[in-house]
UniProtKB/Swiss-Prot annotation:
This is CUE domain-containing protein 1. The gene is Cuedc1. One of its GO terms (molecular function) is ubiquitin binding. It comes from Mus musculus (Mouse). Transmembrane segments: none annotated. Disulfide bonds: none annotated. Residues 1-10 have a biased composition (Low complexity). The lineage of its organism: Eukaryota, Metazoa, Chordata, Craniata, Vertebrata.
Length: 388
């Protein structure tokens, strides 16, 4: 209050326009006052404070005034500080509360009456109207609430679909499918033609995928495709075993396998003679060429005949061939493990050329001989100790 009255007194003594509403009319003449007022009015801005801070300041300035009255005056002036102070001063003077502020002033001089008249008089027609009040960005009643509310969430964005666009395309409009190309018609589908074959062979195995295998058969030939895959895999396994010459010699020494192979060959010849009568004459002349070849090179002819018989093996013969191949692989592994554990002297005693051709019986003989020598060594040592 002291600073407010000092500002009013300084405005009246110097003739400035920063005091109350009519402070410029006391210093100059009647012609220059409106001009000074017009020059200084645009520079004056309406001061607004935060609601709680303004209420605390006004309550400190006017302790004898009710809190609700101060709030009503502040809301009536839309938060303008200067207008609220003017009205509160006027109300305080009318209520007879001016003596409370005289004690707090720096000097005991009373307020000049002209200052009070200029401060409390209503706006004259000569002055400019006050600027248009612009409401604050925040709501005035927001400070009355005990807790501040969160700002409202914006509504979700809804894309307006086109009239002819279906719901599925509207949902996945931003999905970019990978460039895989067009899939075949029977991809992940069971055609009606395949139902009979699947029901007829419920235990059939699924075809395996391989890079070097035969081309896949069409959909209706699912069972034929399974059989072709099985045949292809069996042929590959047989070809790997038949590349080993030692395994080929073991097959030629196996009597049961040779009998089964001959039985399959005769069955194949009988089926071939029934299907094609002209092939019987050609087959009849075939054995005549065999003796000629056997005389020139009997080893090559026997190998060629044996390999030709292997082409016409039946299922039982193939099964026996796999059993022999499994036994041969196990025997080879055992033989390699024995070579690693044998002493160096015994490994040097065997010839390098016959190291891979040792039979299982010969391996047992060497092992028994080695064990016998090891058992004789402690007996000799005990005899020498007893003699000493």
């Amino acid at each position: 209050m002291t600073s407010l009255f000092r500002r009013s007194s300084s405005g009246s003594g110097g003739g400035g326009a920063t005091g109350a509403r009519g402070a410029g009319t006391g210093a100059g003449d009647g012609s220059t006052a409106p001009q000074e007022l017009n020059n200084s009015r645009p520079a004056r801005q309406v001061r607004r404070l935060e609601f709680n801070q303004a209420m605390d300041d006004f309550k400190t300035m006017f302790p004898n005034m009710d809190y609700d009255i101060i709030e009503c005056v502040l809301r009536a002036n839309s938060g303008a500080v200067d207008a609220t102070i003017d009205q509160l001063l006027q109300m305080n003077l009318e209520a007879g509360g001016g003596s409370a502020y005289e004690d707090s002033s720096d000097s005991e001089d009373s307020i000049p009456p002209e200052i009070l008249e200029r401060t409390l008089e209503p706006d004259s027609s000569e002055e400019e109207p006050p600027p248009v009040y612009s409401p604050p960005a925040y709501h005035m009643h927001v400070f009355d609430r005990p807790y501040l509310m969160a700002p409202p969430t914006p509504p979700p964005r809804i894309d307006v679909p086109g009239s002819g666009q279906p719901a599925s395309q509207r949902r996945y409009r931003n999905w970019n499918p990978p460039l895989l190309g067009s899939l075949p018609d029977d991809f992940l589908r069971i055609l009606p033609q395949q139902m009979d074959s699947i029901q007829g062979h419920p235990g059939g195995s699924k075809p395996m995928s391989g890079e070097g295998g035969p081309p896949p058969a069409p959909g209706p030939m699912a069972c034929d495709q399974d059989s072709r895959w099985k045949q292809y895999l069996e042929d590959e396994r047989i070809a790997l075993f038949l590349q080993n010459e030692e395994f080929m010699k073991e097959l030629q020494r196996n009597r049961d396998f040779l009998l089964a192979l001959e039985r399959d060959r005769l069955k194949y010849e009988s089926q071939k003679s029934k299907s094609n009568n002209a092939a019987v004459g050609n087959d009849g002349g075939f054995p005549s060429s065999v003796p000629g070849t056997s005389e020139t090179n009997p080893t090559v002819s026997e190998d060629a005949l044996f390999r030709d018989k292997l082409k016409h093996m039946g299922k039982s013969t193939r099964r026996k061939l796999f059993e022999l191949a499994r036994a041969f692989s196990e025997k080879t592994k055992m033989r390699k493990s024995k070579k690693k554990h044998l002493p160096k002297l015994q490994s040097l005693g065997a010839a390098a050329s016959t190291a891979n051709l040792l039979d299982d019986v010969e391996g047992h003989a060497y092992e028994e001989d080695f064990r016998g020598r090891r058992q004789e060594v402690p007996k000799v040592e005990e005899a020498l100790r007893e003699g000493q």
